[in-house]
Design a protein with these regions (language model features):
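N-terminal binding-site loop/beta-alpha segment at the start of enzyme catalytic domains
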Residues: 1-71, 125, 131
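Acidic (Asp/Glu)-rich catalytic clusters
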Residues: 2-5, 36-37, 59-70, 90-99, ...
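Active-site mouth loops of central-metabolism enzymes
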Residues: 14-26, 74-84, 112-115, 210-219
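Short catalytic-loop micro-motif centered on adjacent basic/acidic residues
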Residues: 42-49, 74-75, 136-140, 163, ...
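Distinct, well-ordered alpha-helical segments
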Residues: 53-64, 83-97, 115-124, 144-157
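Active-site groove signature of glycoside hydrolases
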Residues: 93-113
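Beta/alpha (TIM)-barrel catalytic core signal, keyed to glycine-rich beta->alpha loops juxtaposed to Asp/Glu
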Residues: 109-287, 291-300, 304-307, 315, ...
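Short Fe-S-cluster ligation motifs
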Residues: 314-342, 366
Length: 366
């Protein structure tokens, strides 16, 4: 399949429905079927999603139930796992139950880990995997500076496609630098994949004031649809990923993309107004990717604690934020943090997690 002809909505397999801390297979099957029946077929997974269970679930809910040529499957290699890349790739094929990946990405490249990917000859490895027919296309997901991105793409023309984090609140974020990354990708004329278009749900669960602005402009569409359409309207964007957890989210997203319409001038003005308001709210820019949890020696549920903090700041259902904090910290509270900074070293958003946990202690434990 040509990369500029991928379906517009990609199914991110990192926030699947759960029951009793396990992926709900039956609900996931229902979502897969509804997505496929809508004529969409792009599935994105990774080695550590759902603590390593995402790939095996794909085998059960997708690979065993649909012909191989009916879907486009994407997986990624994470250098930070410190495992042999050939062993990881072999494990991924076995977990997913496939003989090849339609697209394989070097996962989460940034300024601080590029040298590791280079040292392990990962770019040359990708070329070899493609020659062997084990992958159809080769690319990378990226979280670094525009300058380093430009250097990588100039040095490695074998990169066919790049996945970046982009949403309307991060376009001019000095840490994320989505606008600069997008401009570099346009310079190299590469197709673009978008992750975190709704910023882990932050741009779907907005304050009442912001919600009213969106609803005044168009009362018939969801808040999330604005963020998805913003990302999908940008030049060279071929697929926008959404980590969907419910059939309701899926149906809403399908509705957004089934007869997709790019944002018009007036809608961009609404987005600009909302962006200015959101910046004043100073919410924690967590996307609930959960990378921080896997390496935390205290097993602190950092994303859920941050959800409680954000809810408190928005002053929506204030007592519910305290109740949520109590529920998600039954085993380990924010005060259990030993300040090892393991979480901060793997956070794609480069958040000052320790400081925010200290804030949670002040807000919820005093």
């Amino acid at each position: 399949m040509e990369l500029n002809k991928l379906c517009k909505l990609g199914f991110g397999m990192m926030r699947l429905p759960e029951v009793d801390d396990c992926i709900d297979i039956e609900k996931t099957k229902q979502m897969i079927d509804a997505y496929m029946n809508a004529g969409m077929n792009y599935f994105d997974t990774a080695y550590m999603y759902h603590s390593g269970k995402s790939e095996t679930v794909i085998k059960e809910v997708l690979v065993k139930r649909y012909p191989r040529d009916a879907y486009f499957l994407v997986d990624k290699f994470p250098i930070w796992m410190n495992k042999d890349k050939d062993e990881v790739f072999k494990d991924q094929l076995e977990r997913c139950g496939v003989e090849y990946f339609d697209l394989y990405l070097l996962h989460g490249i940034e300024d601080g880990n590029l040298d590791k990917y280079e040292k392990e000859n990962c770019f040359e490895w990708g070329i070899q995997l493609k020659k062997e027919g084990k992958i159809k296309h080769f690319g990378m997901s990226y979280h670094g500076s525009p300058e380093v991105l430009d250097t990588i793409l100039t040095k490695h023309p074998e990169i066919e496609i790049v996945q970046i984090q982009l949403n309307y609140i991060d376009m001019d974020n000095p840490i994320i630098q989505s606008r600069g990354q997008h401009e570099v990708l346009l310079k190299h004329n590469l197709p673009i994949l978008i992750m975190e278009p709704v910023k882990g749900g932050t741009l779907a669960n907005v304050s009442p004031n912001i919600e009213s602005i969106f609803k005044q402009s168009n009362p018939n569409v969801s808040i999330a649809s604005w963020a998805l359409r913003y990302a999908a309207s940008l030049e060279n964007v071929v697929t926008v990923l959404s980590g969907m957890s419910t059939i309701e989210q899926l149906n809403d997203n399908i509705s957004t993309f089934k007869e997709f319409k790019a944002l018009d001038h007036e809608e961009y003005q609404v987005i600009e107004r909302v962006t200015d308001m959101m910046k004043k709210e100073k919410l924690i820019a967590c996307t609930s990717c959960r990378y921080c949890i896997d390496g935390c020696p205290s097993s602190i549920n950092i994303p859920e604690i941050f959800k409680a903090l954000n809810a408190k700041k928005l002053a929506k259902n204030d007592w519910l934020s305290e109740d949520h904090y109590s529920m998600v910290t039954q085993n380990t509270k924010a005060s259990s943090c030993i300040k090892c900074a393991m979480c901060e070293s793997v956070c794609p958003q480069h958040l000052h997690i320790i400081e925010f946990l200290e804030e949670a202690v002040e807000v919820f434990e005093k």
